[in-house]
């Protein structure tokens, strides 16, 4: 398969012609909140021919789905961590069994994806290949078991499951260059694609800081430890305490604009505008403002996240511009967005 930067998704949906996206499968995601120009993507999703979501939440994105297929909850399925092992400083293994039996009519997310794939194959009048049939019958537990047996655990899931606290296999050990699949067993750091960008980097550095109009500020994002992703806002324990939704602004920048701490302000960029509460903070550099990721759940009709919709705040990605991308990967630029700040709600667009 292949992939494209999500910053192109809105245009791929809205641009007519061959290859236009008319259907979408969303799996445990909320791109309306998490991608540049989220308000434009929100409008584009409403024009799809069909959308299906595998999700436990009706959020800003899945509210557009024709069908929502909720998988089992996190305590109804077994778990072996993969992502956070990439951040580990020691070699560990831990198998977490399901705490509760899943209801008879419930399916795990991998089962939902499998059954959708089978249904699509049959709808095309085709039959699954022998390879596909074999893959579809293998549950994640069997895959993890096989990988553990060829690794340092040498005992599979059954051995790891006997140790609820996990197994510490000691400090990390280098596996290079053996794991490299290149003919020379070396990593080519001078590939033509990044090197072409490096050649132009000096030109960008010579330009100096981003040129701003006299009344413009630079917007940057931030994430908090307890609610760093949008879906965590639906957990009261993770959002309790001091409010964290505000736009942080240096006191001098507020004073220049006749704004005081706690005021509602209008923030406008080249691609959108929002209204949000501001907070004076000397932690911010003059000329820079900061808004946290993932807020603004209450601004969209149809969002059914009981706690999240009660939280104040606005989405930073209603201000980011999907046309501003990094040259090599084409991923969106999420920081350093020029914005203007004014008291009160926004006026009509310029």
Residue ranges and their predicted role:
Residues 71-72, 282:
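Electropositive
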Residues 1-63, 73-83, 91, 159-257:
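Extended redox/cofactor-interaction regions of prokaryotic respiratory oxidoreductases
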Residues 66:
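Catalytic, metal-anchored helix/loop core of enzyme active sites in primary metabolism
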Residues 97-159, 230-248, 252-350:
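Long, contiguous, secondary-structure-rich segments that constitute the structural scaffold
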Residues 75-102, 112, 117:
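Glycine/threonine-rich phosphate-binding loop and adjacent beta-strand/alpha-helix elements that clamp
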């Amino acid at each position: 398969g292949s992939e494209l930067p999500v910053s192109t998704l809105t245009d791929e949906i809205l641009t007519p012609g061959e290859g236009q996206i008319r259907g979408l499968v969303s799996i445990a995601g909320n791109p309306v909140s998490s991608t540049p120009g989220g308000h434009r993507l929100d409008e584009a999703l409403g024009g799809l021919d069909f959308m299906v979501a595998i999700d436990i939440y009706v959020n800003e994105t899945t509210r557009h789905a024709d069908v929502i297929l909720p998988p089992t909850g996190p305590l109804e399925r077994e778990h072996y961590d993969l992502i956070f092992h990439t951040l580990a400083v020691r070699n560990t293994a831990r198998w977490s069994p399901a705490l509760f039996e899943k209801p008879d009519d419930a399916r795990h997310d991998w089962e939902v994806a499998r059954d959708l794939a089978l249904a699509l194959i049959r709808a095309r009048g085709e039959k699954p290949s022998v390879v596909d049939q074999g893959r579809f019958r293998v549950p994640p537990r069997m895959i993890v078991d096989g990988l553990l047996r060829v690794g340092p655990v040498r005992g599979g899931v059954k051995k790891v499951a006997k140790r609820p606290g996990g197994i510490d296999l000691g400090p990390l050990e280098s596996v290079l260059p053996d794991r490299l699949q290149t003919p020379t067993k070396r990593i080519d750091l001078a590939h033509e694609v990044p090197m072409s960008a490096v050649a132009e980097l000096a030109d960008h550095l010579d330009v100096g800081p981003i040129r701003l109009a006299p009344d413009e500020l630079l917007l940057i994002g931030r994430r908090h430890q307890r609610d760093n992703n949008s879906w965590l806002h639906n957990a009261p324990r993770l959002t309790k305490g001091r409010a964290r939704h505000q736009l942080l602004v240096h006191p001098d920048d507020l004073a220049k604009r006749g704004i005081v701490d706690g005021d509602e302000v209008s923030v406008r960029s080249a691609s959108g505008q929002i209204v949000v509460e501001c907070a004076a903070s000397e932690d911010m550099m003059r000329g820079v403002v900061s808004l946290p990721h993932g807020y603004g759940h209450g601004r969209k009709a149809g969002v059914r996240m009981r706690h999240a919709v009660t939280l104040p705040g606005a989405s930073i990605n209603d201000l980011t511009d999907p046309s501003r991308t990094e040259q090599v990967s084409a991923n969106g630029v999420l920081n350093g967005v020029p914005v203007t700040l004014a008291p009160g709600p926004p006026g009509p667009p310029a």
